[in-house]
């Protein structure tokens, strides 16, 4: 436990700025309004009472004060339920919801400040050029190929959520010492949860929160996942044969500036509570060939060990969530499969490990004999069914893949319609260009091309054949031109940092800027 205590110890020498006073600064909400609210659900209703693209700092301050009042949220809910379609009460509901969302976006910007400052200072100190952080999206797959070729078993893991709101606040206490700000976050989350319990079912509460408060939800979710992964790093260190050797781990950094390398001492209490569990299992398995990678809420765990060893890691994950995060997670939700006969869906690809056998004749003097060799090949395939399902939800085709028109774009100009379809096609083509079999990708291009033609034909009340004849090669050129700005990810070189009482470890930060956002063009 002494080693765990040193691992979790936080560097208290860093001074953090007080963030709570910034909640009352107008430029914070201007930034939140410009970056986060223009495309939100509650942006349009504000035009009814004349705000349009404006807002009032005085109203934001007034709302913060009213949030602390005991009956504020309850009165808003009662007004909205009794008189939802009455002008005055409807405006009051939209007004309150709009500014509550603005506070959420402003708060998310504030809590990102300490992490952004530390990240910028790190790159300035190390003199790392920004261009060195940019890599092609396909740099990720050679890493998988290099590691999984020597693995035998793989597990698909869905990161569980939501956890209790108080746990989220406690996690942030490790990194932010601004007590008023954390108190306001706790109060806001508690009131928001109670408010929505009147309007929606508890099962949909986290879904609504993630949709209406995207930036804050991503920050809280990433802080929670970061906590899970740093404990995983600790367990991985304990289970290695070579205790002081370095290893690589991918940590996602999407809408979140940096994953901190230290954890707070307060969390040691939770570890001590379940000390018997950790002490009983930390030394019961040794696996120097464990590889873990995650994108958003899905993770893949691969190992060269036995099936029994994978079950050890499986129950290690389950107990971590149950005893440390107080989240009940069923073990059957983590599947263990043999990599040689299993395909897993990850980062938009169906990946599998194929075995290729070959026979070589070897001649030695007068004797000759045949040598059979088996090599592993990491194969990535375009998931046509999943892509057709996404296009079907976005109303570009039917469930069976039959192209249909997009009438919602009929008000746009012809060039804008073609440009949108072409951009989608180029993005998909670039992202899936690393596939070993591209027949499925050609089918997706055909669906988008014909859907574009049907949209234009419906707009001009003509036939598809007429427009294909009229545009012909021009339409084809638009759909098969390479994308000018390629998808990229921030993948810096291994970044060393020092844990308390240990040698340098290496963490790889993976930041996916965008993944074929085919359905987000409305």
Curated annotation (Swiss-Prot):
Coiled coil: none
UniProt keyword tRNA processing present: yes
One Pfam family linked to the record: MatK_N
Gene Ontology molecular-function annotations: RNA binding
Cellular compartments annotated: Plastid, Chloroplast
Sequence similarity: Belongs to the intron maturase 2 family. MatK subfamily.
Protein name: Maturase K
Annotated organism of origin: Iris domestica (Leopard lily)
Lineage: Eukaryota, Viridiplantae, Streptophyta, Embryophyta, Tracheophyta
């Amino acid at each position: 436990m002494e080693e765990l205590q040193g691992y979790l110890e936080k560097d208290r020498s860093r001074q953090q700025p007080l963030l709570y006073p910034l909640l009352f600064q107008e430029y914070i909400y201007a930034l939140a309004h410009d970056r986060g609210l223009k495309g939100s659900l509650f942006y349009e209703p504000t035009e009814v009472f004349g705000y349009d693209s404006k807002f009032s700092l005085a109203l934001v301050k007034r709302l913060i004060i009213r949030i602390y009042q005991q009956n504020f949220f309850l009165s808003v809910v009662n007004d909205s339920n009794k008189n939802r379609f009455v002008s005055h009460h409807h405006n009051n509901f939209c007004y309150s919801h709009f500014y509550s969302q603005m506070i959420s976006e402003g708060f998310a910007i504030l809590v990102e400040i300490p992490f952004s400052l530390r990240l910028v200072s790190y790159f300035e100190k190390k003199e790392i050029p920004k261009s060195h952080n940019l890599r092609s999206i396909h740099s990720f797959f050679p890493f998988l190929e290099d590691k999984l070729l020597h693995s035998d078993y793989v597990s698909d893991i869905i990161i569980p959520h939501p956890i209790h709101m108080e746990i989220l606040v406690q996690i942030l206490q490790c990194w932010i010492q601004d007590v008023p700000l954390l108190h306001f976050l706790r109060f806001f989350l508690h009131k928001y949860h109670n408010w929505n319990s009147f309007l929606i079912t508890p099962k949909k509460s986290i879904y609504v929160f993630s949709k209406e408060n995207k930036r804050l939800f991503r920050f809280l979710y990433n802080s929670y996942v970061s906590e899970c992964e740093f404990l995983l790093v600790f367990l991985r260190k304990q289970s290695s044969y070579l205790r002081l050797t370095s290893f690589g781990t991918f940590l996602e950094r999407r809408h979140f500036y940096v994953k901190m390398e230290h954890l707070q001492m307060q969390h040691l209490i939770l570890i001590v509570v379940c000390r018997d569990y950790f002490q009983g299992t930390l030394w019961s398995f040794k696996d120097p060939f464990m590889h873990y990678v995650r994108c958003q809420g899905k993770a893949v765990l691969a190992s060269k060990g036995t099936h029994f060893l994978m079950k050890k890691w499986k129950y290690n994950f389950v107990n971590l969530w149950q005893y440390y995060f107080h989240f009940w997670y069923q073990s059957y939700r983590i599947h263990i499969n043999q990599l040689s006969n299993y395909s897993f869906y990850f980062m938009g690809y169906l990946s599998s490990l194929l075995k290729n056998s070959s026979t070589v004749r070897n001649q030695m003097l007068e004797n000759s004999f045949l040598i059979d060799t088996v090599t592993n090949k990491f194969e990535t395939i375009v998931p046509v069914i999943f892509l057709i399902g996404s296009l079907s939800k976005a109303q570009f085709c039917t469930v069976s893949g039959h192209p249909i028109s997009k009438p919602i774009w009929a008000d746009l100009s012809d060039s804008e319609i073609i440009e949108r379809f072409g951009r989608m096609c180029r993005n998909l083509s670039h992202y899936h260009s690393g596939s070993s079999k591209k027949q499925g990708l050609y089918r997706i291009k055909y669906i988008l091309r014909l859907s574009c033609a049907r949209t234009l034909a419906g707009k001009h009340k003509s036939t598809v054949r007429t427009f294909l004849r009229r545009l012909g090669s021009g339409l084809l050129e638009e759909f098969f031109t390479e994308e000018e700005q390629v998808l990229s990810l921030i993948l810096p070189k291994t970044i060393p940092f020092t844990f308390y009482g240990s040698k340098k470890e290496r963490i790889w930060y993976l930041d996916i800027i965008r993944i074929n956002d085919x359905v987000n063009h409305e």
